[in-house]
């Protein structure tokens, strides 16, 4: 299944049905009075988190969604039927944004969560509603309320406990494949990983979700390489595991390149707990390894872990360090709902 983490869609809730102007016509009943029924209510547009989804690919092929209109009222005090709701299914971690792509409307973080994005219009009153002691035969009725329409953006931010960051070919996908059942594409060229990957890691009986995103290069925030758009998938992570390739030219510069891109994307990412690891230590000589470790230590201002995803050296220790942070960090993500307007009702005229 193709991965799509952003989609623009048009939604419209159903219009309310019109009220009816009608009078009783039964034989032998003089001055039968009004009998026009009310219109039915329009259907709502509802967004629901569904199990088994991990992409927004369905919204590439269909972008317009309209709920059903309410039917009109009829004579003999018959009210119109309500329109059917339309439900859009999204994966957990999806955010609803306004058309400006900045205003957050709602953030889905729980399976089964539902949010009414657009309420259907109320049905209009039929003339029977307006009957009074001074107006025995009203000849007016309300039209139904129009439904709401808008363009929105759906943006998926994967929910993971820990995230892997680093330059291309730092060994992120290899590490994910070793510590979990995930099978990301692995090859000896940059940008092998084109889409985020998730894996469930088990360490000493404790499980957590680890996310691997495409590598960052200098200028990613300006669109270089694959850009920095995939960093949104590690925004929810509680801890970042920053991998630096021991075979690169200068480990310290490689570390700073990624940190600068994290800062350019969103300062909050640099505030997250970071564990630094020098990877591929089995591929360099001891003297070179010491130089790279010292360079990385000076740049990161902390002692890096020494690991090898291929050989398995130090991997367990790195995972235990992640688990220690994940166990301490509080849950900070809370769903944010848009303020609901007061329900509309037809006006007495």
UniProtKB/Swiss-Prot annotation:
A cellular-component GO term for this protein: cytoplasm
Residue span(s) of domain OBG-type G: 160-327
Name by which UniProt lists this protein: GTPase Obg
Family: Belongs to the TRAFAC class OBG-HflX-like GTPase superfamily. OBG GTPase family.
Gene: obg
Lineage summary: Bacteria, Pseudomonadati, Pseudomonadota, Alphaproteobacteria, Hyphomicrobiales
EC numbers, comma separated: 3.6.5.-
Swiss-Prot/TrEMBL GO biological process terms: ribosome biogenesis
Keyword GTP-binding carried by entry: yes
Record keyword Magnesium present: yes
Cofactor(s), names only, from the UniProt record: Mg(2+)
């Amino acid at each position: 299944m193709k991965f799509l983490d952003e989609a623009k869609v048009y939604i419209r809730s159903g219009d309310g049905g019109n009220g009816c102007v009608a009078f009783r016509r039964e034989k032998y009943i003089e001055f039968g009075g009004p009998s026009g029924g009310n219109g039915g209510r329009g259907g709502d547009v509802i967004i629901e988190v569904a199990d088994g989804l991990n992409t927004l690919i369905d919204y590439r092929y269909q972008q317009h969604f309209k709920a059903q209109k309410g039917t009109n009222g009829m004579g003999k005090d018959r009210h119109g039927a309500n329109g059917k709701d339309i439900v859009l299914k999204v994966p957990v971690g999806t955010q609803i944004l306004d058309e400006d792509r900045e205003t957050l409307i709602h953030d889905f973080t729980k399976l089964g969560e539902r949010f009414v994005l657009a309420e259907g219009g109320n049905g209009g009153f039929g003339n029977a509603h307006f009957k009074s002691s001074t107006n025995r035969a009203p000849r007016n009725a309300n039209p139904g309320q129009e439904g709401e329409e808008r363009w929105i953006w759906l943006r998926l931010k994967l929910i993971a406990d820990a995230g892997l960051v680093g330059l291309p070919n730092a060994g992120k996908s290899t590490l994910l494949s070793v510590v979990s059942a995930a099978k990301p594409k692995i090859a000896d060229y940059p940008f092998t990983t084109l889409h985020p990957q998730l894996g469930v890691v088990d360490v000493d009986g404790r499980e957590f979700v680890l996310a691997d995103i495409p590598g960052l290069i200098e200028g990613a925030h300006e669109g270089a390489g694959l850009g920095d758009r995939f960093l949104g998938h590690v925004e929810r992570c509680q801890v970042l595991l920053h991998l630096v390739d021991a075979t690169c030219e200068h480990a310290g510069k490689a570390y700073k390149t990624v940190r600068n891109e994290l800062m350019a994307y969103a300062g909050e990412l640099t505030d997250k707990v970071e564990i630094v690891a020098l990877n591929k230590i089995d591929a360099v000589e001891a003297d070179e390894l010491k130089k790279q470790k010292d360079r990385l230590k000076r740049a990161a201002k902390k002692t890096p872990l020494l690991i090898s995803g291929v050989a398995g050296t130090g991997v367990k220790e790195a995972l235990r360090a992640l688990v220690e942070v994940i166990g301490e960090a509080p849950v900070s993500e809370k769903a944010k709902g848009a303020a609901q307007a007061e329900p509309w009702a037809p006006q007495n005229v």
